[in-house]
Structure formats: C-alpha cells, structure tokens
C-alpha cells in the first residue's frame, strides 16, 4: 500500500494582519527585509505535489505574527531566549520587532492562529490514520545560504538539503530513502544541520509509531535570488526534483 503523505508548510506566508502590523516597531522597508529573510518563500509552490498527495496544511499568516513551529510555552522553547518564542519580539538581526504582548493579546493571537492551525494539523493526521492506518508528515522548509544572526548554528558549511529527524518518528528506512534520493539527483545532504528535528502533532508525539515525520529544508540559493526574493533559473528543476523524491517515499 502506498504511504499517505501529509505536507506541513508553516512558514510560506507573507501575510500580516493590520492589527499585528500596528504592533511592530519597524518601518515598512525594514519589514520587507525581515520578511525576505524569515519567510520560507515559495515552499507552498515547491511542495505542491498534486500527483502524489492532496493532503497539506499551510499556515495562513506570516511566522512574524505567531510561529506555529514553536512550543506554546516559552519555558519549553529554546528560541524564546533570543526573542523568538511562539510570538517574536526580536528580528533575525537581534533588534526589536515588537514589545512583549500582554496576557490578553497573547491569548488572542494564539487562539486566532496557533490553536486553529494545530487543530487542523492533528485532525489531518487522525484522518490519515483512520483511513490508511499510517501517516507520513513531510515538514516543508527552506533556509538561507548564509546563517542569519539569530540562528543557533552559525556554521558556514551549509548543504543543498537539510533533513531533520526525530528519534521516535523518523525510521531509518525513511531517512535513508530521502537522503539517497536527493544524493542521486546531485544534491549535497546533511542530517539535522543546520536545523534539526521535525514536527508531529502533540497528541501523537512520542506515542504513535504509525505517525512518521521528516523535515526537508531546501537551500534558498538553489531556487531563488535571496537578495530580491525572485525565483531563480533552476526553480522548476528543484520543484520537479522534490516531486521525484516524494514519489519515491510514497512507493517505499
């Protein structure tokens, strides 16, 4: 039986509601630059794989509003130490983005964006488990070719492809299959470098082995001009190669 795939695309949106924009301390020009740095631009297009799966969860607003891939509790979120918990107060350059929201605003933001996203995510996984008895999440991201100041890993040796894993939810066969598929296409591949881990709904995390997950991060230099955000000449090829890799996962 083919493996049912769910695409999780959390950081592709550029949308910032006016009520949130009004809280930001940076100019329009600075905001445009920050969106260019922090958005996983075009991942919703690169990972649009209609011949392989029609199951996808795409976060509708920018991560600068609320980041769905952070722990809700800042005490559990390592990035909160640099002002990038679930609600960012710092920019990628370690300057002020906004003041810390009060309890009321924080609750409103989480209820408006974070909680609905995770409900949809959990429900989508539950549906696949019910229908197919298993679910494979691909956590879809991209990364800058040079480390941004906020990043914990400042190493310059960045691969074409970064694969993020979880000891419980990423079986060896899955990691090996994805890694070998990208290598055969001519890409350099690193595991959990420069970014580590992969997402699973908390209802299943470390509990349900039928839920598998792997993060695929694409180096932006492969498909876009990082200084402008425009698509690069190899955009179509990278998109096709992602589809090739995903099709092999389905058949594994």
Question: What annotation goes with each model-predicted range?
Answer:
Residues 1-137, 142-252:
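N-terminal catalytic or cofactor-binding beta/alpha core of small enzyme domains
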């Amino acid at each position: 039986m083919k493996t049912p795939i769910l695409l999780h695309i959390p950081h592709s949106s550029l949308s910032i509601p006016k009520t949130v924009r009004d809280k930001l301390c940076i100019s329009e020009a600075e905001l445009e630059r920050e969106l260019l740095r922090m958005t996983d631009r075009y991942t919703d297009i690169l990972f649009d794989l209609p011949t392989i799966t029609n199951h996808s969860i795409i976060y509708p607003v920018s991560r600068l509003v609320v980041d769905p891939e952070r722990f809700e509790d800042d005490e559990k979120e390592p990035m909160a130490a640099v002002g990038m918990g679930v609600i960012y107060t710092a920019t990628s350059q370690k300057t002020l983005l906004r003041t810390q929201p009060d309890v009321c605003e924080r609750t409103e933001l989480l209820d408006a964006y974070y909680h609905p996203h995770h409900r949809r995510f959990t429900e989508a996984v539950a549906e696949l488990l019910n229908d197919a008895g298993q679910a494979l999440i691909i956590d879809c991201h991209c990364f800058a070719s040079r480390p941004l100041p906020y990043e914990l890993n400042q190493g310059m040796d960045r691969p074409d492809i970064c694969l993020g894993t979880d000891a419980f939810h990423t079986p060896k066969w899955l990691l090996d299959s994805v890694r070998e598929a990208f290598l055969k296409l001519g890409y350099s591949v690193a595991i959990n470098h420069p970014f580590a881990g992969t997402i699973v709904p908390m209802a299943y995390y470390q509990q349900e082995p039928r839920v598998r997950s792997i993060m695929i991060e694409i180096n932006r230099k492969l498909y876009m001009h990082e200084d402008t955000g425009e698509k690069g000449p190899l955009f179509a090829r990278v998109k096709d190669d992602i589809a090739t890799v995903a099709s092999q996962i389905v058949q594994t």
